[in-house]
């Protein structure tokens, strides 16, 4: 089943007030460019976004050519419709907007914001099921805690997503400390 162009175009016209209001229309499709955190950041700076969600076979190509500004995919797999990808995109964008997160700088320390995955997170108790929180996190030495977090982030990225480190290294984006940690990991 392919969605016909007229209902989609009529909806677009209503949303844009017959073209008087410019919106950035994103079609959620597995054929689109894969969503990245950098693109999420860029989209979060735009004023008016509209998501077009196909279903089953998608939408008539003519309406895509007429009104779509960008096609985005959330990964190399197929769902029955674009609704879930649109929700994922909306959530990832909204959390970057002022007032959404309690700590507005929190997202800058999370996985994929830069070129590292996030370091491991722990809560209390200090020991659970025989697994202990690393002692350094109880040390009170913020410098040591920061260094541990950086080492863990680089190590985790090296083990789970080496492609991210390789890209950052090739682009010259690694700090001196990150490069030293990476070099040490490679020498093991």
What are these regions (language model features)?
Residues 2-55, 61, 98:
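S-adenosyl-L-methionine/SAH cofactor-binding core of RNA-modifying enzymes
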Residues 84, 96-136:
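Internal, active-site/partner-interface "lid" segment
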Residues 28-31, 53-56, 75, 82, ...:
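Fold-independent oxyanion-binding glycine-rich loops
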Residues 50, 71, 77-78, 126, ...:
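Short glycine- and Lys/Arg-enriched binding-loop motifs that mark or flank ligand-binding interfaces
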Residues 59, 63-110:
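Structured adenosyl-cofactor binding patch, chiefly the S-adenosyl-L-methionine
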Residues 10, 14, 88, 92, ...:
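Alpha-helical scaffold segments in soluble metabolic enzymes
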Residues 125-188:
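SAM-dependent methyltransferases
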């Amino acid at each position: 089943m392919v969605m016909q162009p007229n209902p989609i175009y009529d909806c677009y016209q209503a949303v844009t007030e017959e073209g008087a209001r410019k919106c950035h229309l994103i079609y959620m499709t597995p054929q689109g460019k894969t969503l990245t955190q950098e693109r999420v950041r860029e989209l979060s700076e735009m004023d008016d976004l509209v998501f077009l969600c196909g279903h089953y076979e998608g939408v008539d190509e003519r309406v895509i050519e007429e009104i779509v500004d960008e096609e985005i995919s959330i990964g190399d797999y197929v769902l029955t419709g674009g609704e879930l990808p649109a929700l994922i995109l909306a959530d990832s964008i909204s959390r970057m907007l002022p007032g959404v997160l309690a700590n507005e700088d929190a997202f800058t320390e999370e996985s994929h914001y830069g070129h590292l995955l996030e370091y491991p997170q722990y809560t209390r108790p200090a020991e659970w099921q025989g697994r202990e929180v690393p002692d350094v996190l109880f040390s009170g030495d913020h410098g040591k805690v920061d260094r541990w977090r950086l080492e863990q982030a680089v190590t985790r990225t090296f083990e789970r997503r080496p492609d991210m480190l390789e890209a950052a290294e090739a682009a010259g984006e690694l700090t001196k400390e990150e490069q030293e940690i990476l070099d040490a990991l490679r020498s093991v």
